[in-house]
């Protein structure tokens, strides 16, 4: 399977790539399928049922909102973030929904959108089924979709493929493992980012690749800036107060930013994840729950590394993408499948390796940094309090961003040789996730989620 860096870094809406971005894409795919089969005009009603983690924590993750907006044709990349909640309230109050913003039908929020808290479909914890009926009640179409992490969606026709779409694009330097990536780098003399650039040419010109990645970086910058300027209480009922803006004022007043670099990194990550928790526009990196780590380390690179420039940003994102693909291919980036180690752990690994790349590291040092970043996130559980992407998620991104910088610096002090390979740690992460109780995989039925009183 060919995966593009633009599959891993996609612009979307918070608070969750698997529970918000993925379901919105799935619902939109369903509505477009109705149009494609020329039955859209005959639809009188639709029903959606959410299973597993989508059902257990969907309300806290904004899944119902995402499904409704997706049915109306909204895309995660372009959805009106500011008006989304208002539109959902209009649907609830009026009992009317516009499929693809074209065909209006009746819709009961209570009866036509069902969340099963303890029922799971066989393939993946994030499953959802949609049905469409005509005026007589006859079924026009039914489809089951799985949101497999990072906004990636598969339907029931592609079960087992674990991808958005089957893509057999021929790449110049195909690889599936870290060992294969290192071998290609040695044979060609290319850096990991240069190898990735050659592969991305299968889909886009070099100018399109660079401009596309810099567009994504600008969205990350805007998200960080918003998070550092907005105050108040995050939505959802936990009454979690935004802290990034206050921290930014304090750090600016204290001066000497270089002496406080680690605090700035933490701040950048928390700013992004506060925006994500508020349902703002973010970039999956590779998921929304871990969306603050890569932007934070990129801000560290730009603001604290001498000689940093936009060319380095492009190289950083290409190298991060290469590492992310290894996790996507050989394990999982879904908290509902392997716990938070698959989200924050993968992002920490990607950021660590990418930073080593732009610090001038060899391919071996990049692989070493990525391995360190994942190794020290093994076993990390996903136990969001109240099913919200707030506690412990916001602080956890800050901690992991600092850890990523530390991992890169450690790797740069060595020659790239080490005992545990990236492939081994990815395999270990997958096995650890398989052994992990479902209580700790984005169901809010264990850990902090049951030991913290929601008030």
What is the meaning of each model-derived region?
Residues 45-58, 90-97, 316-329, 371-384, ...:
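Short, mixed-charge aromatic SLiMs
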Residues 76-254:
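C-terminal regulatory domains involved in ligand/effector binding and gene-expression control
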Residues 419-455:
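Extended hydrophobic packing segments that form well-structured cores
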Residues 1-11, 37:
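An N-terminal structural lobe/cap that precedes and organizes the functional/catalytic core
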Residues 204-339, 447-455:
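Accessory "access/gating" subregions that flank catalytic or transport cores
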């Amino acid at each position: 399977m060919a995966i593009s860096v633009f599959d891993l870094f996609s612009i979307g809406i918070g608070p969750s790539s698997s529970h918000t971005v993925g379901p919105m894409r799935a619902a939109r795919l369903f509505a477009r399928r109705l149009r494609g089969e020329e039955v859209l005009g005959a639809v009188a009603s639709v029903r959606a049922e959410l299973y597993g983690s989508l059902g257990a924590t969907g309300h806290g993750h904004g899944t119902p909102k995402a499904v409704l907006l997706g049915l109306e044709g909204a895309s995660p990349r372009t959805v009106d973030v500011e008006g989304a909640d208002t539109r959902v309230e209009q649907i609830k109050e009026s009992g009317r929904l516009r499929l693809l913003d074209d065909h209006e039908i009746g819709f009961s929020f209570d009866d036509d959108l069902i969340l099963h808290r303890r029922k799971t479909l066989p393939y993946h914890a994030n499953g959802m089924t949609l049905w469409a009926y005509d005026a007589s009640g006859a079924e026009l179409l039914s489809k089951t979709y799985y949101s497999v992490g990072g906004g990636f969606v598969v339907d029931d026709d592609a079960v087992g493929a674990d991808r958005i779409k089957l893509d057999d694009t021929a790449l110049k330097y195909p690889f599936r493992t870290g060992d294969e990536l290192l071998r290609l780098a040695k044979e060609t003399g290319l850096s990991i980012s240069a190898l990735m650039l050659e592969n991305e040419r299968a889909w886009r010109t070099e100018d399109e690749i660079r401009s596309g990645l810099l567009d994504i970086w600008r969205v990350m910058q805007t998200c960080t800036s918003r998070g550092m300027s907005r105050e108040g209480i995050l939505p959802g009922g936990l009454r979690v107060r935004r802290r990034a803006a206050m921290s930014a004022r304090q750090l600016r007043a204290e001066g000497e930013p270089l002496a406080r670099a680690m605090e700035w990194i933490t701040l950048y990550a928390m700013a992004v994840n506060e925006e994500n928790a508020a349902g703002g526009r973010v970039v999956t990196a590779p998921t929304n729950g871990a969306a603050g780590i890569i932007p934070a380390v990129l801000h560290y690179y730009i603001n604290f590394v001498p000689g940093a420039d936009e060319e380095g940003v492009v190289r950083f994102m290409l190298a991060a993408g290469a590492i992310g693909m290894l996790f996507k291919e050989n394990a999982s980036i879904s908290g509902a499948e392997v716990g938070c180690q698959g989200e924050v752990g993968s992002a920490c690994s990607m950021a660590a390796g990418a930073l080593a790349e732009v610090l001038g590291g060899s391919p071996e040092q990049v692989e070493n940094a990525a391995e360190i970043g994942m190794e020290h996130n093994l076993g990390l559980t996903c136990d969001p309090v109240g099913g919200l992407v707030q506690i412990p998620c916001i602080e956890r991104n800050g901690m992991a961003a600092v850890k990523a910088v530390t991992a890169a610096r450690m790797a740069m002090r060595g020659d790239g040789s080490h005992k545990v390979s990236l492939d081994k740690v990815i395999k270990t992460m997958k096995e650890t996730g398989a052994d992990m109780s479902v209580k700790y995989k984005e169901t809010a039925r264990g850990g902090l989620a049951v030991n913290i009183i929601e008030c």
